[in-house]
Amino acid sequence: MSPVLEWDKAEERIFELGVDRGVFYPYDQQTGEYLEGVVWNGLVNVTEKGAGGEDNKQYADNIVYANIRSEAEFEASIEAFTYPDEMSECDGTSQPEVGVFIGQQLRKPFGFSYRTKIGNNNDNLDFGYKVHMVWGATPEPTEKSRDTINDSPEASTFTWDLATEKVPVTGRKPTAHMWVDSTKVAPAELEALEDLLYGSDSESASFPTPDEVLALFTTP
């Protein structure tokens, strides 16, 4: 006899929240490789947005003859109190002399990783987390508001809307966004990924390709 469905078991009341462990990976457009990662402090929000994937119905013989779906794209936005110095060039800012900045310059792509928490009713926020990786991100122009200081001062935040360029994945369609769920993978495999992304005693932080990430978790 099949078991009766049961809702809201304590260990199954799962939810997600938070964002931390931001890392920025500069991209060398000449070599096509990502450079050593640097910490991105002050993350307030990362919003993941889907784009594309829309129906394009083709009609013939008075019926829908074919339904061609456009390519899905990944877009995102980042809000933060601050950002790494290396981000300036990606945001269209040049520094011709130390401390002197020029806007409206060419924008450069970068890689980005961040972590979101997974909680449940038993372990609260210690249940697990997801490590997200974004390739080929390029910021689009956004507003920067400068407000007067008043009797309820608040620190300003910076925001960036990101377009992405997908990268190859063997056996799958190209992607710009990938994530790993700590509750579903072996701890040793997760540690190997984090050693790459965050650095270790012997290696600097680096940004792997999707295939290199998959190789860490491939079942023998």
Question: Positions of the model-derived regions?
Answer:
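Solvent-exposed edge beta-strands and adjacent loop segments
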Residues: 2-85, 134-155
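Mixed-charge, glycine-accented linear interaction segment located at domain edges/termini
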Residues: 141-220
